[in-house]
Amino acid sequence: MRLNSQIVFCIVVVISCLSMIECKMGSRIYCSGSLSSVELFSQYISNYALRNDDVTIIYAGMSVDEINADVYIADCSAYDRAIPQIYMISYGLIQFPIVGQAIVIIYNVPGLSSHNMIIDRETLGRIWTGNIRKWNDIQIQNLNPDIASQLPNETITLGYNDAYYLSISEIMQLALRNFSEEFANAHTIAGGKFGNMIPAKQGYAIDAGEASESRIDWVKNTPFSLSFADFATVYPRNVSYMHMYNKAGKLVEPNITTVQSAMADFKEIYTTNDFTIDIFDASGENSWPISWVNYISMTSTFQQADCIRTKELLDFIAWFYMNNEIAEIIKEYQYYPLDNTIKKIAIDNMYNVTCNGKVSQEHQYLIAFGSPLSIMASWPNTWASSMTTVKYYASLSDQAIELQKTFSGDFGITIKDFDKNKYLSSTMEDIGVSHLAAFNIVPAYNIPEFIGLNETLVLNYETIVDIYLGLVTNWNDSSIRNSNNPYINSLLPNKTITVVVQKVESDVNELFTNFLSCKSDKFNNAIGPTNLPEFDFVSNNVVYTEDVYGVGNTLVSTDYSFAFWPEPGIRLLSHMAIVQAASIQTSTGTIIKPTNETLSKAVDNKINSINRRDIEDGSWPFIAMMSLVYHQKTMQSFSKASALADFIYWTQFDDTAASIADTQGYYVASIHPTILRENLELLQSFTFEDRTVSKVANCIFEGTICYNKGTCNNNVCLCNIDREGQFCELEKTQSDTNIVTIILAVVIPIAFIIVCIICILVVALIFSLRFRKGISDDWEIDFHELELGEQLGTGAFGEVHKGTWRGTEVAVKMISPDKTITKDIERNFKDEVRVMTTLRHPNVVLFMAASTKPPKMCIVMEFMALGSLHDLLKNELIPDIPFALKVKIAYQASKGMHFLHSSGITHRDLKSLNLLLDIKWNVKVSDFGLTKFKSDVKSINPEKFAGTIQWTAPEILSEDREVDYILSDVYSFGIIMWELITRDQPYFGMSPAAIAVSVIRDNYRPVISDQLRSEVAPEYIELLTSCWHFDPTIRPTFLEIMTRLSNLMGDSGMTGMSSSSSNSSKFDYNSFGKVQQFAINRTDPDGIVQNSYNRTDSYDLGSNNSHSSITSDTNKSNKYLRQTNIQHPTGEVVVVFTDIISAAQLWEFDASEMKNATILYNKLVRSICNECGGYESLISKERNSGEGSFCLIFSDVQNAITFCEELQKQLVGVNWSPKLLEHPITAIEKDINGTIIYAGLRVRIGLHFGSTKINYDPISRKYEYIGPTVTTAAAVTTITHGGQIIMTEDVANKLSTENSNKPVCLGRVDIDGIPDSLVLYEYVISALIGRFFGGVTRKNASFVSNETSTDYDDMDTDNSTFSARVPHQAYQYHAAIENNERYLTSAGLCSWVINYDEIKMGEQIGLGSYGVVYRGKWKNVDVAIKKFIKQKIDENHLLGIREEIAFLKKLHHPNIITMVGASLKKPNICIVTEYMAKGNLRDAMRTCTPKLEWHQKIKILVNIAKGISYLHSFDPPIIHRDIKPSNILIDENWNVKIADFGFARIKEENAIMTRCGTPCWTAPEIIRNDIYDEKVDVFSFGIVMWEVLTCKEPFIGANFMKITMDILEDVRPKIPQDCPEEFAKLMRKCWHAKSTKRPTMDDVIIVLAKFCPDISV
């Protein structure tokens, strides 16, 4: 079947504007290209959108002929083959290779036991020539002896295509010409066309289409067929393909190794900048014989109004060359990245593209190769240049230098001694060698008994050699003991030494074998200098690693191991020294330890050419010098040369670069005066076309910068006051000094008078301005300039709202403390805001403005669209966050914190809620500063601001006198790192007091399970645990954290990274292209969390503004399609609605059972949907997801029908609870034959077919389908019975005629809300044919309910024929649907569910443990509305809230607050209760005049006790856990009611969002985190008794920890002397330390009643 040429695959990315700036239309790039590249560009574009959302990139896949016709409007074109050079020159084109791919031979031979037949080149050529026609030909049998007997005597039917010469069809023909001379001759005679050859002429070869997909489908549907296709298209499909013998005679299969081998075979041609070659039939031993490279081409001379578009296109190309993560992603789709040297040459070609006569690409990409070093991961990442990116690839030092010969790298790094004379050839005569750093190479060991020791093991040369030669195999060997002191010897274990050997060519191998060869003739004779040594070890004495970075990781993970390794690699392995460097004992007995000092001495010896073998002056004997090798005069552009010069200078003279080097254990080379002089002279002579390139070149003189007597500014020396000359090399003469003195003597007095006058005028002006209207800073604004929108969050210091300021979306933090804001507090607030507005850093939230006048004090910040890191981690719509992205998040957060600390600001409240993410997933630190202001406000109301315990360092919890807040921030960061890898809430289930006690007393931290340790990089775990170490001095600084995370980002044991980029990270969010697909595959979610920081992008299908849409003719139906990566369907789709009927009645019947049933139903729907290839649309804002209704999208009608049928059948088999089945709506029903046709939830299903509009949610990375098609499907569902499937005529028409079950026409129906009547069909499931709907049943069917058989008259319903047309006599279908069922998600009809629009919100009257409390009205009744702080509640937890509200609604007691109902729609989830006019007991007692009488106090306490007793009377008891005066409410008649009970889960989660209160009322068993019962409420009541008695606050003046420890140590509030003894005795019993000694609340009521006999009990 030939692919219709009119069908075009379109991939479109529509990028939303940054939220903090005005919305702008970004550049639009349109490229057309081959169909084989659709998936490749889909991955490129969707992942690039996460990096750059200011550009829209469109890729249209089409035939080659259509590509050629499209070149006049396309910005670029993608072909499967290179355009010949002659056409490139003639048309002014430039092309870039993209990826390597494989063409495979696909076949369909039924009955074979093997999926991979074997073919050779000649046999394949003879098949296509027509000389081999049968599958059982002897040549094919000989190649496949295992299946020879299975090969059929059937003709091989060939599927070919004769597309344009830039297609894979042409590549296939050219490859066959190389494979077989027979084919080449026949092909020439046929005019170079498959279609003119014998197989086509004789009818057993047909044109199977240009696209690989078409040929694959043809092969699958054609027995005994054979064709060819690109492997990327074949790989995910179930089709057999052949392995081949290549040109070298080796059997190979298509994969990254064999294709990259083929590319490498032509590498020398590529390095000459010839990208027009084919790579099929490569000669390499491992090369796949039909390999190919696809290309992207464009004009080299753009002429257009806006050249930004050209730059954006080139940036996109550079990105997919440079970004490591996208390279890993495309490998999964069988696209194979180019060799790094080829990428470098291709990138250099970008600078040949011009726009309007100017070079389009100004950004410089420096591509470097060299030995894998941690410093070359950290330096490029830290060197932040907006115009330059450094990309560093690991290689051998010799390879890095060799690549300089062909300009295949911009520079190389070598750690071997560099012999410049060796390379002074015609190709490298201008070689420059700049020494950058030096480091120790050490004998490293991992002996657990030595961890934490201040002393190190000592080894001599002979012992080290004997270890490597297998002569010393035990750590307790006498040769080791002889070099160490008695203490060390006492610790030496009787354990086998495991030697770690790098079984791959490496510089370190060569260096240490050379070193030992110089020290020992025995080693030299046995092994000798080599970069791949071969040792003769017993198997249990060695561990091999083939990773160039693997020795370090192996050492740290292998106890009792040993190896030579660079010291920086050891430092970066772990915070605690698990792997340590041994000291060396020289031949004279001198012991030398590897330190900075011994490294410095060794460098000095090396520079002064001292033979270290003969000199023992305390220098470390084995070091390596890291040198940068480059072309001094012939780099390929001035810009590249200048960028490299800047980088070299930065590494040697920047403080940050030096700090990184020092942290990792490197010696910056320019510390040494000789190297300093050499490096500066190299920079001075570094030129391009005789122009100096360094920005300090003109300041360099005699190996100094400005003679060390001035500074270099803009390449000019600014001399000290006593120096002059071009380089400050001259001292100023005395005469000059005298003249200056005379001039100064005259000028200064005059200048002084003028300055005085100016100062007086300025002071007067300032005084005038202050007097009239005060000082106005640039950032000071009037509050009325802000337009406030939805509330985003609530904290201890106020609310955060989304808003608009001067047309820009912003976040506005309202400061709302008590009204006692003093002038000093106001001034402190203004002073601190002034400092914060000066801070600018990409990882710190931008402070934009502030209003500092009470009562409308606020801060205006940039709006962070994705909300907090905490929300992201809790968002189960994003079920998988790649570890690499987690590391990057941590790295960006640490950068922000390092900046703050460097600016003199400590955070003091660092937590995941205060790390915000913008729309591009960049992390920024927020809620810092205002330290003085917060302190002032806390002093006003200390109980309200007790802190966020989970992230608080122990020294702060214990209120140490001298706290280093920088290191306490590091502690908090450690908790955040734990959150990142677990996505859990720290200390979940523990009270704040329990957390504090456990952290301080027991050194308790969040649990890191063994499984987690095995899944997460040990370097990450080590860094995390060091951050939260109890001893602050052990904790790293944020600079060290940055460095260690930077190295971790590269997955290196020794150095942490194989390649790096200053602008492009290894994990540029790209794996989130998979998050969207995986999110819909979760069949067991806890639910769905949505973020109130929300943006929605919308697009129409079929338009050029589609977001990553791919339109194709791939709507092929499989009976039961199983997918692991489900793309969202586009184009015309089937919309399926499922809905639970009578859900409200079931929730009213038993909320607990209905919650569990709904969770089972949700899991079942999602599981079957995934198996059938469906996509779950985000639900509309009118209803929550998971409450009974689903909107599912299918691209194929048959898959949709399969889903419907499977769902209805499997619902009957669910293990529903017996309690649920008691209800008539969910009871079991059987047909007359005893077959169960109903059980449990009744679900109705409606279907419609058509186009939709799609909204994209960037937070969940999912799509919402809307529009008339969706509305119609929903409307059809509302008139459908439970258990019934109804579809529109559009669906019925698309249903395959081969389907065994035919839909039954119900006629034309009018549906409310749908303008036109619809012809509807019912789909009848044969297994459930006995179901009865609306008085009509199918032929020969009836049902039995409640085990009793009831006969029904047979009805004539002819299902034998099917027609999608309306019958001639159309009749009206009247569905007998009750009014309350004409509503989807009927769970919303519960009596206690309130429409939020019916609530009128009033003033805020309080802030509870899980919500902000407002006064309001509902249906003209005064109510209190508690709006949940946490609105991002996942699906299952929201069902739990629904269950709890249903239960609480049934509670009725005069001393329990009455639950009116709840609104359950985000973002307005709230509960509504009766309104209590006098507020809470605490406030009432404070404001009560006159003071309460004894009788009143007893009455209040009795009523409180009655309320608690009522809660405890349930089985199991309802435990309040938070009894205190602020949760006891009073009405105008002093009636007491208990509030704030229930919702334990929500309270727990909100404990991290609001600052916890003091633990005055908390029972000791809760603080100890012990098991507790309802007696904890009795304890709290005892404290309340004391408060009511004294009208005072308990533990007044004590801090959080003091109160906590007092409670644990049985210290209680002091009882007044005039307190009645019986009352005091009851209090003591209530607050007894042992819960078993406390009375019940019923006992309490009886005792209290004795004090006032007139009170009824």
Swiss-Prot record:
Residue ranges crossing the lipid bilayer per the database entry: 742-762
Active site: 909 (proton acceptor), 1522 (proton acceptor)
Region annotation (Disordered) ranges: 1089-1115
Residue ranges of domain Guanylate cyclase in the record: 1134-1277
Topological category with respect to the lipid bilayer: Single-pass type I membrane protein
Boundaries of every Protein kinase domain copy: 786-1049, 1399-1651
Annotated InterPro entries: A/G_cyclase, Kinase-like_dom_sf, Nucleotide_cyclase, PBP_domain, Prot_kinase_dom, Protein_kinase_ATP_BS, Ser-Thr/Tyr_kinase_cat_dom, Ser/Thr_kinase_AS
Keywords tagged on the record: ATP-binding, Glycoprotein, Kinase, Membrane, Nucleotide-binding, Receptor, Repeat, Serine/threonine-protein kinase, Signal, Transferase, Transmembrane, Transmembrane helix
Matches recorded under CDD domains: STKc_MAP3K-like (cd13999)
UniProt: ATP binding residues: 792-800, 813, 1405-1413, 1426
Catalytic activity: L-seryl-[protein] + ATP = O-phospho-L-seryl-[protein] + ADP + H(+); L-threonyl-[protein] + ATP = O-phospho-L-threonyl-[protein] + ADP + H(+)
GO molecular function: ATP binding; protein serine kinase activity; protein serine/threonine kinase activity
Primary enzyme class: transferase
Enzyme Commission number(s) from the entry: 2.7.11.1
An individual GO BP term: cyclic nucleotide biosynthetic process
Glycosylation sites (chain numbering): 153, 178, 238, 255, 352, 454, 476, 494, 596
This protein's name: Putative serine/threonine-protein kinase/receptor R826
Organism of derivation: Acanthamoeba polyphaga mimivirus
